[in-house]
Amino acid sequence: MAGRRRATWLGNARKPKSMKTLLKLAAAGMRGERLVMLTAYDAMFANYASKAGVDVLLVGDSLGMVIQGHTDTLPVTVTDVAYHTACVARGNVDSVILGDMPFGSYQASVEDAMRAAATLMQAGAHAVKLEGGATMASTIEFLVKRGVPVVGHIGMTPQSVHAFGGFRVQARTDTAVAQLKLDLAAVTDAGAAMVVLECVPAAVGAMLASESKIPVIGIGAGPRVQGQVMVLHDILGWTAKPPKFARNFAAGTNNVQDAISAYVSAVRDQSFPNESECYA
């Protein structure tokens, strides 16, 4: 009886014959298709997002802020992400599930990174994301060679918030832009399938995306990248002080799934983000 009730409200008792994969999405992104990534933390919202056409469900360490109530992502543990990954996996239809590697789970050694990645994949992740450019290249390579698909994350990396002196726009100087180019090349050469680029001027995002050999998924990086990622709570208008690059897609809609569908459509047709939602 419980199983039948679950199938009724989730509506995904039967998985589709063809699931999306990270490598297929990466190839599509490089062909010019716009990729859509969105955070998800539980079965119901994962189900809404997957049905709406979201390509990648990111079980982000942002859960520390929007779910647990912390002021940053640093307190989040592998156990936390694994729990929410398992929840998301139960609601997913055909999206790729991307598990975020939390602070302290991969920086000390590649062995730590492998253990953390294995835990997240055993919970239901199809790939993992970790922050850092050239300094993390050897870790990315280690994981990829052992069968773990990896997404990189450069630019504003929230786990380094204290090193940055707060959540700040990056790549404001020629030196910083040059370093971002090196970081992008390093994670690409290490085998990352795609890379998240966060909080940089739109012109920098466009330049990096045009030169990249892998899809660049922007968050606060302008419209001229291969895809976008957003925090679920931001696109639903639930954040008290949303970032500049956020848009409330729930305004004028009747339900959550309509809001997520509007986000998906806006990314696909490149109407999101607009100029006012970008950094100059």
Description of each model-found segment:
Residues W9, P16-A250, N254-A280:
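Alpha/beta enzyme core
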